[in-house]
Amino acid sequence: MVKAKRSSAVKEALLYEGMQQLAENGYHGTGIKKILDVVNVPKGSFYNYFESKEVYVAQIIHEYNQQSVQLFDPLTNKSEATAMETLETLYKHMLDKYVAAECQRGCLVGSLAAEVGHSLELCQKAMQQNVTNWQTRLASLIAQGQREGSIRAELYHYVCRTLFHRYGGAAATKAS
């Protein structure tokens, strides 16, 4: 039996649509068939790209992480901005995105963690990688701010925790 040729464009479309569906419907509310219908891919072809729904969602989380890096890194590489200005710009962008989604979509990783955090090992590892990625970048930015004098040194741990959880907290508040 000849295996169907894998198209990177189809895989990217599946990842994109899956990310949209997961953000809107959560893990358990997202059906593979609906995603395949939107992308116009036969159901049997899904397994040419992904071994399982868990592998698929873990790759979506990885893609989400890459998108976060693409947002974060250019902001932090602006040498003319202070660390505090960069943090303000970053959070303004995230809040604008949240408002543009009519407060219906928060952090994909936060939403998935609440729904399937401990039950899907591959997804849990991908989510932890995302969290570590954000925490590392925020810690670096805060340390830069402390060197510049725009962030007080004694606030380090408090600021790190608060900034990291601030966006997720807004999303959780929406759900309650």
Language model: regions and residue ranges:
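Amphipathic alpha-helical packing segments from all-alpha helical-bundle domains
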Residues: 69, 73, 85-89, 118-147
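Helix-turn-helix
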Residues: 13, 21-59
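Short coil/turn segments at alpha/beta junctions that flank glycine-rich nucleotide-binding fingerprints
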Residues: 24-28, 105, 148
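N-terminal intrinsically disordered/low-complexity leader segments
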Residues: 1-9
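Amphipathic alpha-helical segments used for helix-helix packing
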Residues: 86, 101-122
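Hydrophobic alpha-helical connector segments
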Residues: 59, 73-104, 157-163
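Hydrophobic/aromatic-rich alpha-helical bundle segments in the mid-to-C-terminal region
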Residues: 109, 122-132, 146-176
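Generic hydrophobic, amphipathic alpha-helix propensity
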Residues: 10-19, 35, 60, 64, ...
